[in-house]
C-alpha cells in the first residue's frame, strides 16, 4: 500500500509549484494528474500553443450553463489536461493580479499573508526577469520572464493611439499599477516556454521523494473520522486507493469543487 506525506491532486501550475516546495523541504509527495507529460515539442514553442487549441489532447472542454447576460448562450470553457496545467498550454502572458484583489483575500481570511505586501515576496522568489528588477521583481528565480521578441506593427499603432487618447504608457504592469497601455511580458526564456514543469519539476525527477502518476483520475476522497486520509483513483480501468497524511486539491476551479 502506497503512503505519502502529501498527495497533490492535479499536476497543474499550482500543484507543481506546491509539490516542488514540499519536496525541497524533505516531504514525500505524489502528484496525480489526469493528463499526459508535457513533452510535445509544440508545447515548448512560443507559437506552438495556437495549433493546440483545436482538438488538443492537452485540453479538456466543458460547457457552461446558459448565461442570462449573454442571451442565454452557452460557452466552451477550456481546462488544461497535461502536467504543468495552464503553464504548459496558455498564451504565456505574465500578468499578476491587482494588489486590491489580494488585499481583499487577506481581509476575507483575516490573514495578512494573503495580501499584496506578503505575496509579492513569493512572486519575486519565483521570477527570473530579464529586464525588470527592484522592489517588485526577482532576477534569480526559476520562472523566466521576458519582453516579447517580436512586436507587430498593429500593436505599436494601438499603443500610440491609446496614448493620443490620454492613456499613459506603462512599462511594467506587474509593479502594482496596471493603469495605462504598453507591452506585456511573457514566461519565455531562451526562445522557449518556461512552464512550471521545466522550471520546477524536471530538476527533481530523480528525487526519491517525488512520484508522479499520469493519465490518472481521482474519483473520490477517502474520509475517515471526518478527515481525508487518501484518494481513490482510476487509470486504464484499474482502481487504486492511495493514502497520505495530507491531501491537497489543486485540480482547477472546475474539478476541485467536484471532487
Regions from the PLM with identified roles:
Residues 1-124:
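N-terminal glycine-rich phosphate/pyrophosphate-binding loop and immediately adjacent elements
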Residues 230-234:
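Short beta-strand segments that buttress and anchor functional surface loops
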Residues 2-4, 237-246, 250:
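Core beta-strand elements of the Rossmann-like FAD/NAD(P) dinucleotide-binding domain
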Residues 106-110, 253-259:
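Alpha-helical support elements that line or immediately flank enzyme active sites
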Residues 108-224, 228:
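Conserved redox-cofactor binding core of oxidoreductases
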Residues 12-13, 34-37, 217, 244-246, ...:
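Glycine-/small-residue-rich beta->alpha transition segments that form the dinucleotide
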Residues 16-20, 198, 257:
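Short, hydrophobic alpha-helix immediately C-terminal to the catalytic nucleophile
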Amino acid at each position: 500500500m502506497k503512503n505519502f506525506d502529501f498527495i497533490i491532486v492535479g499536476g497543474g501550475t499550482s500543484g507543481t509549484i506546491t509539490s516542488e516546495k514540499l519536496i525541497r523541504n524533505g516531504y514525500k509527495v505524489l502528484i496525480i494528474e489526469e493528463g499526459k507529460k508535457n513533452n510535445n515539442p509544440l508545447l515548448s514553442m512560443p507559437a506552438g500553443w495556437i495549433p493546440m487549441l483545436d482538438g488538443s489532447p492537452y485540453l479538456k472542454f466543458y460547457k457552461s450553463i446558459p448565461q442570462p447576460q449573454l442571451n442565454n448562450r452557452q460557452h466552451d470553457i477550456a481546462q488544461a489536461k497535461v502536467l504543468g496545467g495552464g503553464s504548459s498550454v496558455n498564451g504565456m502572458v505574465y500578468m499578476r493580479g491587482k494588489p486590491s484583489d489580494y488585499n481583499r483575500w487577506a481581509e476575507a481570511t483575516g490573514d495578512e499573508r494573503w495580501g499584496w505586501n506578503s505575496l509579492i515576496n513569493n512572486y519575486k522568489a519565483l521570477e527570473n526577469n530579464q529586464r525588470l528588477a527592484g522592489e517588485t521583481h526577482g532576477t534569480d528565480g526559476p520562472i523566466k520572464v521576458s519582453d516579447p521578441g517580436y512586436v507587430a506593427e498593429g500593436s505599436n499603432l494601438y499603443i500610440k493611439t491609446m496614448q493620443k487618447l490620454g492613456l499613459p504608457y506603462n512599462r511594467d504592469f506587474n509593479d502594482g499599477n496596471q493603469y495605462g497601455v504598453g507591452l506585456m511580458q511573457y514566461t519565455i526564456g531562451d526562445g522557449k516556454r518556461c512552464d512550471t514543469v521545466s522550471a520546477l519539476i524536471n530538476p527533481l525527477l530523480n528525487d526519491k521523494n517525488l512520484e508522479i502518476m499520469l493519465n490518472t483520475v481521482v474519483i473520490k476522497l477517502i474520509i475517515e473520522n471526518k478527515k481525508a486520509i487518501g484518494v481513490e483513483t482510476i487509470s486504464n480501468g484499474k482502481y487504486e486507493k492511495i493514502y497520505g497524511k495530507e491531501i491537497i486539491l489543486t485540480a482547477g476551479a472546475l474539478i476541485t469543487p467536484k471532487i
